[in-house]
Design a protein with these regions (language model features):
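Sequence-level preference for short, compositionally simple segments enriched
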Residues: 1-262
Length: 262
């Protein structure tokens, strides 16, 4: 709900089609386009021209197959419905149990796996937009043997399903820093930057030039403020450390609320 303004900008970008839902029980709003005319005339041309480069590309290509079947009115026949169910079985998390029971002869459609190759180059606008939705900015304060008894550090990260590890590696090339953590037990891979010099030299200058949109910009702003305090070594005194702790608590509160709402 707090990013409704950003959702409305997206709606305007697509020519005003669709609608923005009212907040649900978890305070989430959605931009939805459900008419075949708008999907065929606006949504498909956009994503054909500006291809997705995560695993969602596979879902999009399958979604497009369903749209074309409906455009040809094949969904009006039992055979066409079976084709759609076969495709649906390969999208997102697959089919709910009631559909599996209703269609016992399901043959899941093959997914596109090579949606990205080693020659793909990320562009700044895409990275800024992707970071708006998927990045995280953290301030860490830990006990240490320093005079204050506490040590501060910063962490920028982007996490995705492990199937998108090739994309995560692209961020290393794009930013010129960072590393990949692959959590095989959770099927998650993560691009991480923790070296303070790299955050100051690469991460913050990028987002100053290509700003993050929506409520996450506040997180970035607090993250940046903390970096300035650390750069000036003001975190070594009581007042500066208190400022760092306040900024850390603001960011932690944001992610805690996000987890609750989701």
């Amino acid at each position: 709900e707090k990013d409704r303004a950003l959702i409305l900008v997206i709606k305007k970008f697509f020519g005003g089609i669709g609608y923005v839902s009212k907040p649900n029980a978890s305070s989430t709003v959605e931009f939805r386009v459900s008419t075949l005319k708008d999907i065929v005339g606006v949504i498909l041309p956009h994503f054909d021209n500006y291809s997705l480069i995560t695993k969602k590309r596979s879902d999009y290509e399958l979604f497009k197959q369903v749209v074309l079947l409906m455009l040809n009115k094949e969904h009006s026949t039992l055979e066409g419905i079976q084709k759609i169910v076969n495709i649906r079985a390969s999208i997102n998390l697959g089919l709910p149990n009631n559909l599996i029971e209703a269609f016992p002869n399901i043959v899941p459609t093959e997914r596109l796996e090579n949606y990205m190759d080693s020659n793909t180059v990320l562009n700044s606008g895409w990275v800024a937009g992707f970071s708006t939705g998927e990045s995280n900015f953290f301030i860490t304060v830990q006990k240490s043997k320093t005079k204050s008894g506490l040590a501060t550090s910063l962490r920028f990260s982007i996490a995705q399903h492990s199937r998108d590890i090739l994309l995560m590696k692209k961020f290393i090339d794009f930013f010129g820093c960072g590393y990949i953590a692959n959590y095989t037990n959770r099927s998650i891979c993560e691009y991480i930057v923790t070296k303070f010099d790299h955050i100051i030299k690469y991460i913050i200058p990028f987002f100053e030039k290509h700003p993050i949109e929506g409520s996450k910009y506040i997180n970035y702003s607090d993250f940046k403020s903390a970096s300035i305090i650390i750069k000036n070594k003001e975190h070594l005194n009581k007042e500066g450390l208190e400022q760092i702790l306040q900024l850390k608590n603001k960011i932690s509160s944001f992610y805690a609320n996000k987890t609750i709402n989701n």
